[in-house]
Amino acid sequence: MNRFVAIIVIFALISITSCKSDKTETHTKEHQPHWSYDGETSPEHWVEIEKNSDCDGNRQSPINIIDIDTKPTQQKDTLLKVLYTPKTALKQVTNNGHSIQFDFEAGDSIQYHGEIYHLSQLHFHEPSEHTINGIRYPLEIHLVHKSKSNAYTVMSVLAKEGAKSQLFEFFESFLPIKVNTTKEINQSSDLTTLFPKNKNFYTYGGSLTTPPCTENVNWIIFKEPIIVSVDEVLKLKNNMPKNNYRNEQPLNNREVSINTFQ
């Protein structure tokens, strides 16, 4: 009987040791370095952290756009069509620890160079990631569109401080939101009111501005900023990491076009 008890005790000890080992492995995996905008995991270290990314590529974003170096083209040559309805359906809002992100139901899209890109989400960078003639704006909004071939077209709207924006008031009505939290929205809004009155824009080929920094992005950056209030900027800022932007990347002989309407 004592031998039987001893065997049970040995098996129990083996089992406990095994469980402790498993828990240690899980703990280690959960605490692997993850990219951020600060310290040892800031953009300068993304290449080290994200081993299989394009973050060290030659077509990276964002960039500094210098007006005198851009190539003038006509709007009709770029074939950009914004196919948004007056009631774009917002599905949910998430604080993913990097930005505030609004996700959309399927339906809205743009057509760029003959290909359809479907609107999936928009998020914010404060201050802006792209700069124009060295000027960094208080805020940049990215409207992310994806094609069936998994290519991206991102429309960027820069913002400066001034009067209140009705659309921003709507977005911020869902704040505050804690990190790693999602709120269901299931409401609609007219996103076309987000764009500046002057529709001239810059275009160039680049990458996602966050890991994995994939280099299959068409960038459309409206030249004229929109106006939002100081309070709106601060409210958004309080729900995001400080300075959640990536620094200017080398142009590496890429061409930037300025597209104007006739």
Question: In which residue ranges do the predicted regions lie?
Answer:
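Alpha-carbonic anhydrase
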Residues: 4, 19-262
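Bacterial N-terminal signal peptides
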Residues: 7-15
